[in-house]
């Protein structure tokens, strides 16, 4: 039932994908039906708001000693359900740590409309991406990556973690230390750093931004 919309689709709709080798080498006019099963393709079960869910259910962040075991249990339940569906339908399902971008706002407004304002849960105009540590929590880059690595293991359909650092142009060894930690400890992560350039004076560094103007050192 989950693949009913894709059944009967012919390879001609995207020749590069289905006929020329990007995904398969089907004949013209051939349907993609046989590629929907037997592990060739995957249906992703995306999720977001693990932090908010944990606050609502336990009163604690999922980074707390009380919250983390519960959050991991919920993640394992999602994986168990995907395995159950796969066994029943011969279709691959996988849990996906969704990078929701603007959808975090849409989901937050929908939750507010349905449940009202709940402190720590629906009192912001966004929900936290996937398993991510909430942006307001004080946590260093290494601790964050190590914590989130446990949830990436339970997001086999895809996941990405982020760490924010200041301008590191003059501290490349520190950047390499973070990158090595990522390589050794987590499946996939991104390092975001600030590096600005002023086209008027040529300043290359970090520029302070306000609503009305830019401030250079």
Model-derived regions, located:
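Structured mid-domain segments that build the active-site/substrate or prosthetic-cofactor binding neighborhood
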Residues: 1, 5-56, 167, 184-195, ...
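Conserved small/polar residues in nucleotide/adenosyl-binding loops
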Residues: 2-4, 212-217
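Short, glycine/acidic-rich hinge or "gate" loops at secondary-structure transitions
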Residues: 6-22, 66-68, 87-98
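Short, charged/polar micro-motifs that form catalytic or ligand-binding hotspots
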Residues: 36, 40, 61-68
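Predominant activation on well-ordered alpha-helical scaffold segments within soluble catalytic domains
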Residues: 47-55, 72-79, 176
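Short secondary-structure subsegments characteristic of cysteine-rich extracellular domains
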Residues: 63-83
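C-terminal, active-site-flanking charged/polar segments
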Residues: 74-80, 180-190, 214
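Catalytic alpha/beta core of large soluble enzyme barrels
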Residues: 100-105, 111-209
């Amino acid at each position: 039932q989950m693949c009913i919309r894709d059944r009967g689709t012919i390879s001609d709709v995207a020749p590069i994908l289905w006929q020329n080798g990007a995904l398969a080498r089907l004949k013209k006019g051939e349907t993609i039906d046989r590629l929907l099963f037997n592990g060739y393709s995957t249906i992703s079960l995306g999720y977001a708001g693990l932090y908010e869910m944990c606050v609502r259910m336990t009163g604690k962040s999922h980074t707390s000693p009380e919250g983390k075991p519960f959050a991991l249990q919920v993640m394992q339940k999602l994986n168990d359900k995907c395995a159950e569906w796969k066994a029943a339908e011969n279709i691959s399902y996988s849990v996906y740590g969704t990078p929701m971008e603007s959808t975090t706002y849409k989901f937050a407004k929908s939750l507010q409309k349905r449940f009202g304002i709940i402190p720590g849960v629906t009192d912001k105009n966004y929900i936290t991406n996937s398993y991510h540590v909430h942006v307001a929590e004080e946590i260093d880059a290494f601790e964050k990556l190590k914590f989130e690595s446990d949830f990436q293991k339970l997001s086999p359909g895809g996941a990405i973690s982020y760490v924010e650092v200041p301008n590191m142009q003059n501290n490349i060894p520190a950047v390499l230390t973070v990158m090595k930690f990522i390589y050794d400890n987590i499946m996939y992560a991104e390092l975001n750093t600030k590096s600005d350039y002023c086209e008027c004076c040529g300043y290359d560094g970090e520029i302070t931004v306000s609503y009305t103007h830019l401030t250079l050192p």
